[in-house]
């Protein structure tokens, strides 16, 4: 297998984004570039030079419709969703099946193709008390989900009998997929279209992710690697809300946890699938 470098990886991700964008345009689905991708569009008109992923987010109704339509994407682009067999993430990914991406090579490695992350956005209750309770519940189950991926298995191997028994019980009750379904149900409790504040509830930091829907709509289009993609109309306020007031300082970008330049990935073309990317 031939190893794929950062620049080629970015081009493959861009090709996935272009296919996704074409399908969203065809069916009038709303989406917005997000995270490091949005910051890159604002400050670099493309990838932050060392960034190795693309993030987009969609209102929940569009996200669920997209899942039904994803079969129309090119054959080599596969939709990956949380399932009983594989539930390491809480959101959708579009992966290039011609490639192999190994995250954290070694004991805790995870394998997929080169991918683009697609996050669903949900509504927040307007009432402050309800919002606090809602976020508390989400945070509790999010912590349980991430604990279920590793810690319960470790507990089962403990020398301490009590810890070992707890690990066995928790591993049966709190399976990752069961916790994902609980989180998804919680996140959808306040419908996106009926709320004035929205955000990414199922993953990340829902407290910081909360913002007025007016920051999103109507979308504006920003330059990214020679193409224009939809972004929140209040993208500057949105980025400052999430990353702080230093977003235009390019030196500061090296310190942002979601786009650190030391991601531990190994990426390859699968034998016989080595094809040049479109430019």
Residue ranges and their predicted role:
Residues 1-25, 67-126, 144-244, 249-279:
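Conserved catalytic core of two-metal-ion nucleotidyltransferases
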């Amino acid at each position: 297998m031939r190893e794929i470098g950062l620049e080629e990886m970015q081009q493959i991700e861009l090709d996935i984004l272009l296919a996704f964008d074409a399908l969203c345009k065809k069916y009038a689905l709303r989406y917005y570039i997000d995270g490091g991708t949005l910051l890159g569009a604002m400050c670099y008109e493309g990838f932050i030079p060392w960034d190795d992923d693309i993030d987009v987010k969609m209102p929940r109704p569009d996200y669920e419709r997209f899942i039904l339509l994803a079969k129309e994407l090119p054959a080599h682009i596969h939709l990956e969703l949380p399932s009983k067999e594989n539930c390491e993430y809480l959101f959708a990914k579009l992966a290039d099946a011609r490639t192999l991406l190994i995250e954290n090579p070694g004991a805790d490695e995870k394998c997929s193709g080169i991918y683009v992350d697609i996050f669903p956005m949900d509504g927040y209750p307007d009432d402050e008390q309800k919002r606090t309770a809602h976020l508390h519940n989400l945070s509790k189950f999010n912590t349980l989900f991430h604990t279920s991926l590793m810690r319960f298995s470790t507990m089962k191997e403990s020398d301490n009998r009590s810890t070992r028994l707890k690990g066995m019980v928790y591993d049966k009750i709190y399976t990752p997929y069961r916790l994902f379904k609980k989180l998804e149900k919680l996140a959808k409790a306040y419908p996106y279209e009926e709320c004035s504040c929205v955000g990414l509830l199922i993953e990340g930091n829902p407290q910081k992710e909360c913002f007025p829907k007016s920051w999103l709509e109507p979308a504006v289009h920003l330059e990214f690697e020679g193409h224009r993609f939809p972004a929140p109309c209040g993208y500057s306020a949105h980025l400052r809300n999430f990353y702080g007031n230093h977003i235009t300082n390019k030196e500061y970008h090296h310190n942002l946890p979601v786009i650190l330049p030391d991601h531990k990935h190994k990426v390859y073309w699968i034998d016989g699938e080595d094809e040049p990317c479109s430019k």
